[in-house]
């Protein structure tokens, strides 16, 4: 009798995706983040589901309902802390996953990469609408400031903003629809993840060398299931430590004050994972220009496959490009720091220089470095 997992229509799909999947024999720990992101998504959906059972999306009771979850619901404090810090873990894994893709040339799987960028944008949208739900000061003012950016769109801008608000300001209608968006988007993300994996399994994984790994493949199970399990244990350890010991470390103290439309907080800033984009937005003194730069900061990822000039896929054997990659990493950390600082000198000029460098590195310097390295590697006989 043949094995059930190889014949049953449903089991067959699971088998080809997670058990008998041929995987390169030399993929490093940087390839763990895909599975970690899957686990993060499951954690967020489950904790979110239990939070939604007790949350009320009404301006009068939203803040109180979150306090009620933390005080009166069995393990409500834990569910809420896991959900809030789970978002931080999600973005940490996302940034590392994208960084891995850039470093090792995974973006040359164009369909997988493009779906990945759409996924990144969808997760960012989900996190933004989710941050509004507790209806604290930073929730309210964050929603007001970011939705207001759409008014920079010529002609239809102000109409569009009022349409999204469902009125003339961020109010009950806005909160209700943001809750609806926050509930539906994770399921859309799940569908996109399946498409992401579908495209990935068409080509198979890349590997650190950037060389075609077809000649040396090993089954996913048990080799990479056990490796992913180790990554999972480490991530759960970090997440639980955060949620148990310092759950509010990454949050904003202003969000412990109920939303008040009459009182603006001194420094409006998003969660840490949006600070780099927020810094780029603020570095341009023009409203429409800032919005376009904000969009470009993420959408620039879509043109990375077109900017690949090197004959080698990975940066593993390309020292000049490696230096530029780590400059880009340091630059993003600088932007993250600047995004959390007040709008005053020297932070303004640092933010502007870091924003220029961010785009220059991706669009100009890295493609040039690829061409230079190719030229240096060409045999030059007399």
From Swiss-Prot:
Sorted UniProt keywords: Electron transport, Heme, Iron, Membrane, Metal-binding, Mitochondrion, Mitochondrion inner membrane, Respiratory chain, Transmembrane, Transmembrane helix, Transport, Ubiquinone
Positions contributing to a ubiquinone binding: 201
Binding site residues for heme b b562: 83, 182
Cofactor annotation remark: Binds 2 heme b groups non-covalently.
GO biological process: mitochondrial electron transport, ubiquinol to cytochrome c
Summary of subunit composition and partner proteins: The cytochrome bc1 complex contains 11 subunits: 3 respiratory subunits (MT-CYB, CYC1 and UQCRFS1), 2 core proteins (UQCRC1 and UQCRC2) and 6 low-molecular weight proteins (UQCRH/QCR6, UQCRB/QCR7, UQCRQ/QCR8, UQCR10/QCR9, UQCR11/QCR10 and a cleavage product of UQCRFS1). This cytochrome bc1 complex then forms a dimer.
Identification of the protein by name: Cytochrome b
Organism: Monodelphis adusta (Sepia short-tailed opossum)
Gene it is expressed from: MT-CYB
């Amino acid at each position: 009798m043949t094995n059930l997992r190889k014949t049953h229509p449903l089991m067959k799909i699971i088998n080809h995706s997670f058990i008998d999947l041929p995987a390169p024999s030399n993929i490093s720990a940087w390839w763990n983040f895909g599975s970690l992101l899957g686990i993060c998504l499951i954690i967020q959906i489950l904790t979110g589901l239990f939070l939604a059972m007790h949350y009320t999306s009404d301006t009068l009771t939203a803040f109180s309902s979150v306090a009620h979850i933390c005080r009166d619901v069995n393990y409500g404090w834990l569910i809420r802390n896991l959900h809030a810090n789970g978002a931080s873990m999600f973005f940490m894994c996302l940034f590392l996953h994208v960084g891995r893709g850039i470093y090792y040339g995974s973006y040359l799987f164009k369909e997988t990469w493009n779906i990945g960028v759409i996924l990144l944008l969808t997760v960012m949208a989900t996190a933004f609408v989710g941050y509004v739900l507790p209806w604290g000061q930073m929730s309210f003012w964050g929603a007001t400031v970011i939705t207001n950016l759409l008014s920079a769109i010529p002609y239809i801008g102000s109409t569009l903003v009022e349409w999204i608000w469902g009125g003339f300001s961020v109010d009950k209608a806005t909160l209700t629809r943001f809750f609806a968006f926050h509930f539906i988007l994770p399921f859309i993300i799940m569908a996109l993840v399946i498409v992401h994996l579908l495209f990935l399994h068409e080509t198979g994984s890349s590997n650190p060398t950037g060389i075609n790994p077809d000649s040396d493949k090993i089954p996913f199970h048990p080799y990479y299931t056990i490796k992913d399990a180790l990554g999972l244990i480490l991530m759960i350890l970090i997440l639980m430590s955060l949620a148990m010991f310092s759950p509010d470390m990454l949050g904003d103290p202003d969000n412990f004050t109920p939303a008040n439309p009459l009182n603006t907080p001194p420094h409006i800033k998003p969660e840490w994972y949006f600070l780099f984009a927020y810094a780029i937005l603020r570095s341009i003194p023009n409203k429409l220009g800032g919005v376009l730069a904000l969009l470009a900061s993420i959408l620039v990822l879509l043109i990375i496959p077109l900017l690949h000039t090197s004959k080698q896929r990975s940066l593993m054997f390309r020292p000049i490009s490696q230096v530029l990659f780590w400059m880009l990493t340091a630059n993003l950390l600088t932007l993250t720091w600047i995004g959390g600082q007040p709008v005053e000198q020297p932070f303004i000029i640092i933010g502007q220089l870091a924003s220029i460098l961010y785009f220059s590195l991706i669009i100009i310097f890295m493609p040039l470095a690829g061409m230079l390295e190719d030229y240096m590697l060409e045999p030059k006989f007399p």
